[in-house]
C-alpha cells in the first residue's frame, strides 16, 4: 500500500545553501522532518545551480519520512539574471529598468517549460514576456 501524504511544504531556497536556520528549519520542524537529512540532500542535489533560488515541494508522509521535488527557478529570477539587474521596477508601467531580447526570453521559456502550463514554446514565451513587462523590462527583437 502506498504511504499516505500527511503534509506538503513549499519553500524557495537558494541552491546549495539550505541550512537549519530560519526559514527552512522552522518550516520543516513543524512538519516533523529530519532537518539535517533534508538540508544535506537538497544541497547535494542543487550544488550545480549555485546562485539560483530553487522552489522545492516536500511531501511529508505519516511515518515522518519525506520526498521532495525541485522545480526550475522562478521566471523573475531568470529574467533578472539575463538582464543583469538586481531588482525589477517599482512602477513598471512608468519606469523601465532593463531590456531583454526575444532570444533570452526563448531560452528562459525552454528552461521553464517542464514547470509551465504551456502547450508549446511560443505560449511559454508569451508567459515569460508578460512576467518581464510586469517587472518593468522591455522585450526587444
Swiss-Prot record:
Q: Which keywords accompany this UniProt record?
A: Methylation, Ribonucleoprotein, Ribosomal protein, RNA-binding, rRNA-binding
Tell me the InterPro entries matching this sequence: Ribosomal_uL11, Ribosomal_uL11_bac-typ, Ribosomal_uL11_C, Ribosomal_uL11_C_sf, Ribosomal_uL11_CS, Ribosomal_uL11_N, Ribosomal_uL11_N_sf
Name a GO CC annotation attached to this entry: cytosolic large ribosomal subunit
How is the subunit organization of this protein annotated in UniProt? Part of the ribosomal stalk of the 50S ribosomal subunit. Interacts with L10 and the large rRNA to form the base of the stalk. L10 forms an elongated spine to which L12 dimers bind in a sequential fashion forming a multimeric L10(L12)X complex.
List the transmembrane segments: none
Protein purpose: Forms part of the ribosomal stalk which helps the ribosome interact with GTP-bound translation factors.
- GO biological process entries: translation
Classification via HAMAP family: Ribosomal_uL11
What this protein is called in its record is: Large ribosomal subunit protein uL11
| Gene Ontology molecular function | large ribosomal subunit rRNA binding; structural constituent of ribosome
**Coiled-coil regions in this chain?**
none
PTM comment: One or more lysine residues are methylated.
Family listed: Belongs to the universal ribosomal protein uL11 family.
